[in-house]
Amino acid sequence: MFSAKDTLAKVDPELWQAIQAEVQRQEDHIELIASENYVSKAVMEAQGSQLTNKYAEGYPGKRYYGGCEYVDVAEQIAIDRLKKLFGAEAANVQPNSGSQANQAVLMAFAKPGDTIMGMSLAEGGHLTHGMALNMSGKWFNVVSYGLNEKEEIDYDKMEALAREHKPKIIVAGASAYALRIDWERFAKIAKEVGAIFWVDMAHYAGLIAAGFYPNPVPFADVVTSTTHKTLRGPRGGVILMKAEHEKALNSAIFPGLQGGPLEHVIAAKAVAFKEAATPEFKNYQEQVINNARVMARVLGEERGLRIVSGRTESHVFLLDLRAKNITGKDAEAALGRAHITVNKNGIPNDPQKPFVTSGIRIGSPAMTTRGFTEIEAEQIAHLVADVLEAPSDEAVAATVREKVSALCKKFPVYGA
């Protein structure tokens, strides 16, 4: 039998030390990666619960294993909360990731060799929307749409491509697009050409839940999302769908792609969905947008950096660093030395290789979870610009680290 005294620190001190070092890094660094966030203690408690012991192939009320009566309750709570949060007819909370949720859509509605249409990865899309090296690009004929000269989605060209190629599926959504997306226009185009309209709202889900970004659920046949990022839950995926597609999509997840679901993660998702329905979460998401706008304004208007698309209408934006003669890779490293975490990111039609890039992506979800407001957002933007103006200057990095340390101590991730 296991003893309650057999803690991780005692059983595996080597791993414990690595985890503690990561905990300290999260406390000591300002996190500006748009796809990262911090979860609540309640979410972590659910994910670390004894539900991890239970195998539960199938769905609530229709399991292939006995002893599922309580995980059925937990999973149904998650389903019901998710449907209510976004106004969906049906939902699946079992996908282990956003990518697996996306694979399920492709499995349910297309066959290898069929044509699908998605936003070009080079212009802000996601690799699961048709990148050549991804399953979606290997198995399907991919037609990509992109941006116009204003670096906004080129709806007119996308419409022309859809009429020409008549794809089985049209996917809207992005991993590096700062502006609002016109779901209704996508839906009209998809209907005209007879395509399934699929939205991947992974980056915007928290903003949508709080009412600060358009909700795609009324317009789309199916919506996928991650549960982390702006939604501030555990790492995982979900699918929202019209009732008529529930059987096909549920079958695509199980038995199509997965076996037993991760019921401990599903329980953590349920907690996050409850948190996302609170007034506090709405206030948080409003602050997320305000902080992103302040950082974009300071970096663009005051510090002379080019913001891709010229502005942000969400939690994220891209910085084009070509005028500074620094690559995204080097900028990421320089900011990391100053204890500011970002990710290198391609800009539209980037001439650099994907592991080098000409830009960085900046997001406000994690920093806002710490309690940062417009005041701190302005300070952070100036710190970022200071480093980018002298990326090899250790004295600048040291000064910025000191200021970052003061901010992090004032706003801990997990307070008392």
Swiss-Prot record:
Give the EC class as a word.
transferase
Entry's Gene Ontology cellular component terms:
cytosol
Could you confirm whether the keyword Transferase appears in this record? yes
Q: Which UniProt keywords apply?
A: Amino-acid biosynthesis, Cytoplasm, One-carbon metabolism, Pyridoxal phosphate, Transferase
GO terms for biological process? glycine biosynthetic process from serine; tetrahydrofolate interconversion
Quick one: where is this thing mainly located?
A: cytoplasm
Q: Which reaction does it catalyse?
A: (6R)-5,10-methylene-5,6,7,8-tetrahydrofolate + glycine + H2O = (6S)-5,6,7,8-tetrahydrofolate + L-serine
According to its UniProt record, where is this protein located?
Cytoplasm
Binding-site positions, (6S)-5,6,7,8-tetrahydrofolate:
121, 125-127
Kindly indicate where the leader peptide sits in this chain: none
Record PTM N6-(pyridoxal phosphate)lysine, positions in chain: 229
| PANTHER family according to UniProt | SERINE HYDROXYMETHYLTRANSFERASE
The job of this chain, per UniProt, is described as: Catalyzes the reversible interconversion of serine and glycine with tetrahydrofolate (THF) serving as the one-carbon carrier. This reaction serves as the major source of one-carbon groups required for the biosynthesis of purines, thymidylate, methionine, and other important biomolecules. Also exhibits THF-independent aldolase activity toward beta-hydroxyamino acids, producing glycine and aldehydes, via a retro-aldol mechanism.
Q: What is this protein called?
A: Serine hydroxymethyltransferase
The coding gene here is glyA
